[in-house]
Structures are given as structure tokens and as C-alpha cells.
């Protein structure tokens, strides 16, 4: 028979009394009234904040978006198939935030900053709010440093500066993503961190972009945030803000970053879906009234930090798809009004074999030559005007039967200028190579060649200059100016290469 020892029992009771903690924990809970289509309506959750994360019984997380008098509208970050009517929900007291660290470089993640590339977890000690306020006026300075894209047409005539927001707009299949990916490839060795956000894209397209980055060694300074077409609308809506939070982390650490949103119109469609299901009143094209704010609060986060904050920068390149060239639709006009200029890609030019299919006439950068090095300004200053005059003359020449010699010469020069702007995909050029190309065209050195020979000659000239006149590149990179010495070296190289080229063509 077991003997009961009173002193042992009393000791245990005393210990328990001493360990007893009278802490009262208040949990804000609610009950699921209705769930479906990625939306849940919750009764209760009286003190929930707008945008607060809520947790369902079976582990799904949601965001409280609609705070109504008798229920709360929650959008789900998952399929929500296991959520049942009547199950409990608790408020977490947190606004959506993600972990941030250097460890994200070279990784492919989703909108919740979870890796989806099968390479294990990412360690991070800090976190940032997904939606943080944009820098104020005092925290910024004007854009003055160039962000080189490696594309002659952009860097010479529609320059992009670090901290600028430049829209890339055009119909489907006109090479918009190619312009953005070439820009990322060109940042190699430039100390710029790149973030590529794929919103509602095909998984195969995203995989292709990631493969290109890996093959070209661009993943070491790039983060890919991907929410493909089969992702829930909530995650497609959040993905751009996640990308912006990661880019901001580096910007506030005095680094230069570039972020590509591909594309915000898909984010707007996801937001429209969520809003309509939450029974928010529809506006133009059935978008909710705050769809402008959706994009403005995202793009305003791009900035050039003031010297007090370390002069970091975040350059935003949103990509918007138009329907048969209609830039007056709701989302394109909204994004055009928010950004500092746009690069317009034309389906007609693309089909005519002019690639990148940039319509230089209606593309514009509101930062302008402030985002160019002096050498580029010296060489490319007049090229946009010359091309515009050529386009006008070409349209007129279609109706004229006989043209005088001067007009014929101007047309021939224009055709060669247009030819030198053509570039293969994933073949960005350095600033020095671009200066060589533009100078050769604008100063008439290509006029004696056939149009079909222009590209071949320029490739050979750039190679010849690199091997035989390395001083040219040194002068441009050190002084950032097209000096008389540099011009003399270039003229010499053009003449020498032209003689070699013509002999080569004759044989």
C-alpha cells in the first residue's frame, strides 16, 4: 500500500503556488461566417486594425481589409480549403511584414518572402513592413547619376537615372520584359542590387528569365519575387510590395537598387478581383476607387536618398501591357501620370525587325540629360532630333516621286541611324561602346556603307578599338568626357577599320 507523505504533497503545492503567474492574456477572436473565392467574412474581431494579419484555426493567414459594422472582410493568403464555417479566427496584432537580409540575393521567393527555388531556408535577423511609407521630400535629392541599361536607344535618348521611375509600356510580345532583363544583365559589376517581381506571369516565362540570369551570372546580385498566374489574388497583390520592401532594405543601407515590376496591371486585376468579392463599389473599368493609390504608394517608394541618408537609390521600372496600342486605358494612364517618363514599345516596329522596338518619338524621360555622363551628352545630344526629322521626312518621301540630293542624303543617314539602334537580346553594350556607335553614325562615317553592312562594321569597329586603342576606353571611364584626344583616337580607329572592312568586303 502506498503511503501518502503529507510534507511532499505540501511542498509540491507550494512550488505550484510560487510558479503561478497571474498574467491575463486577451485574445481578439472571431467566428467565420462565410468563406469562399479567397475571401472570408468574420463575426467578432472587434478591435482588429485595417491591414492586420489574422490567423485561422487550421493555420491559414489572412489580411483584414474591410472593417464593417457587423463583420470583417478578410482576404486569404492561401486557398483556404480547410477553413470551415463557424471555426474560430484570432487577430495577431501584427501588420504584414517580411524578413530581410543579404541572404536573399540570388534567390527566388514568393510574396511572403519564402524561398521557392528548393535551396533551403534563408536566414534573416531583421524584418521590414511590406507597406512602409515612401521617403519624404527632405529625405530625397534630385536624380543625377545614370542607370545604364546597355541599350543604345535608351541610354542615348531616353536616359534613366538612379532613383527614377521609368515606365516600359507596349502591347504583348513587343519585348518589354527583354528590355528589363537586359537592364539587369547590364548591372553586372556596377554595384547595383536588382529585384525582379513577376506578378501573374506564366511559370514557364519566369523560369526562362531566371535561367537567363543564372547563365549570365546575374543572379548573384538579383532577387526574383514570383507569384505566377495560378497564385491566389492576395499574393499577386502583395508581391510588388514585398519586392519594394527588399529593395528599400538595401537602399537604406546606402546601396543602389533597381526594381522591375512585371507587371502592375496584373496586380490591379488581382486587386479588382479582391475588391469586387469584398463588395466594394466598382468604378471605371470595374476597378475600385483606390486603384490609383494602389500604384502610387508603390512607385513613390522609389527614390534617390539625400546625402544625410547615405545617397542610396531605388530605381523602379514598371512594365504595363496595353491592348492594341491603347495608352489611354485606365491603368496605363494612371501609371504614366505617376512615373517620370515612359519607354513606348511598338508592335509595328517589332514586326518590321527593329528590335528593341522602342518608339523614340513618343518615349520620354523627364529626368533627361541629368542622368547621362558628359561624354554621352556631347555625342548623343542631337540624335533624338535627327531621328524625329528623319521619321517625318520618311513619311513625306512616300508621297514624293523625285527627291533632291540633300533629302536623299538625309534619308540615307536616318536609315543608318535607325540601323545602329538595333540590338540583339541579352547583348547590352557598355557606355564606351555606345559612344563609339553613336559618334560613327551621327558623323556620317556609315553613309558610304550599305545598310546591311552597318551592324557588321560596328561590331568589328568596337572589337578593333578595344584591342588596338585601349586608351580610348580609359579616357572615357576616367574623365566621363569625350575629350579631343578621345575623338582623335576614335577617328583614327574608324578610318583604319573602314579601310580593312572595305578590303575584306571586296575579297
From Swiss-Prot:
Pfam families: ATP-synt_ab, ATP-synt_ab_C, ATP-synt_ab_N. One of its GO terms (molecular function) is ADP binding. The record marks 363 as: Required for activity. It is a peripheral membrane protein. Its main location: plastid. NCBIfam families: atpA (TIGR00962), PRK13343.1 (NF009884). This is ATP synthase subunit alpha, chloroplastic. The lineage of its organism: Eukaryota, Viridiplantae, Streptophyta, Embryophyta, Tracheophyta.
